[in-house]
Amino acid sequence: IKQNGKTSIQQVFPWAIASFNGNYIKIPLLKNQLGVSSEERINNSVQNLEYAFADGFNQLIQPKKRKIAVLKGNGELEDKYVADFFATLRDYYYIAAFTLDSVAEKPKKTLAQIKQFDLLVIANPTEQFTEEEKYILDQYVMSGGASLWLVDAVELVNDSVSGNNFAFGKDLNLTDFFFKYGIRINP
């Protein structure tokens, strides 16, 4: 700030702290947006201010209760590709990775562990599911568990010799699993 020929720096913290019943939450007042000017960022933040406070108060009043499991072990997407999606959800849900590695030796224990989650996210698997894994997933859904499948049934291969692209159907051994629930994925 320039006043009377003197320059002074004032430190500003672009967030507010809200508390309720001993819980505290940081409410961002300045919304980060890549590729926009400072003026646009400030204008967008002012427009978003009411929502930011309402969302912060909602998080204080209704703390995290539900749990989301992110399935790993069948060639699912790396964390860097779904980081933004889960970063948005982590303010509202508990999120943990879950593997079906122990299905072959301890299927009952694996099923009991997976039932502790309210939602199972399977993000673009690339490796086939075994019959045991499908059985555990089926039992999870049949006992009231929800699942979000992000499946790409086509694999695109670039032929380096001819320079052409070819699309092939990807067999994840899930056709019968989905068919039981009335879903059919055509590659």
Residue ranges and their predicted role:
Residues I1-P187:
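Short, surface-exposed patches at the edges or C-terminal ends of soluble domains, predominantly
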